[in-house]
């Protein structure tokens, strides 16, 4: 009883193995056939590696800062264009639409240090500090388009009073001469011709000098006198209230005013006559006052 099932199992397993082997062989054969067909098709097409395409991800992400990267990209783009047979438009250079030009190699840090700047030639420093002016076109050099020259503002002319050309110089009087002239002026402000001649000879001065000094001294005395009179007028002005507030009252004082007001209000006589109440004075004066705020002189 035990041998039969075993035989059946063995047969089943053998059959399964044979069936599975046949299916695997068939699938491998189909894959080989597809591979050969794909290889034939790929062989018929031109082979272009993805790294040679100028717009591939590898080409765009490539590090162009490395030496020779730009040349490799240009060569790859030219190879791709030759393989594809595509025509470039006019005015477009091969590889011009690729990645931007690689920056120049960075200078060493010591080039921008203080020592490096000091070691630079003077010509380079002068050229860097004062760049040349751009050339002007002919129409800009024409005087028609050039701005007018700036006008220099001259200083304003002096507006002081000009003296006469034939003016005589000022006489430098000595202290003794000034004292004698002041003493003589206090005695007499106007001198006669004889007195002036005698006095000028005693002071070693000319008659014209003495005459002019007396004229100036009289004008000065007049100014001083006018200023003194103005001060006296200001000091003599009384500090009185205006005439509008100086109300006049009849003689008799405020009591008479109150009595007159009561008589006119309640009558001259009567059984119900009240005693007059004291009234405060309305004005400042109890008699007729004719003073005003300013005195006329």
From Swiss-Prot:
InterPro entries assigned: HD, HD_metazoa, Homeobox_CS, Homeodomain-like_sf, Msh_Homeobox_Regulators
Record-level GO BP terms: embryonic morphogenesis; inner ear development; negative regulation of gene expression; negative regulation of odontoblast differentiation; nose development; positive regulation of cell cycle; positive regulation of odontogenesis; regulation of odontogenesis
One GO cellular component, as annotated: nuclear periphery
PTM comment: Sumoylated by PIAS1, desumoylated by SENP1. Sumoylation of Lys-9 and Lys-127 not required for interaction with H1-5, transcriptional repression, inhibition of myoblast differentiation, or binding to gene promoters.
Gene3D superfamilies in the cross-refs: Homeodomain-like (1.10.10.60)
Keyword Nucleotide-binding: no
Keyword Transferase annotated: no
A Pfam family: Homeodomain
Biased composition (Low complexity): 25-38, 77-88
Function: Acts as a transcriptional repressor. Capable of transcription autoinactivation. Binds to the consensus sequence 5'-C/GTAAT-3' in downstream activin regulatory elements (DARE) in the gene promoter, thereby repressing the transcription of CGA/alpha-GSU and GNRHR. Represses transcription of myoblast differentiation factors. Binds to core enhancer regions in target gene promoters of myoblast differentiation factors with binding specificity facilitated by interaction with PIAS1.
The protein, known as: Homeobox protein MSX-1
Native organism taxonomy: Eukaryota, Metazoa, Chordata, Craniata, Vertebrata
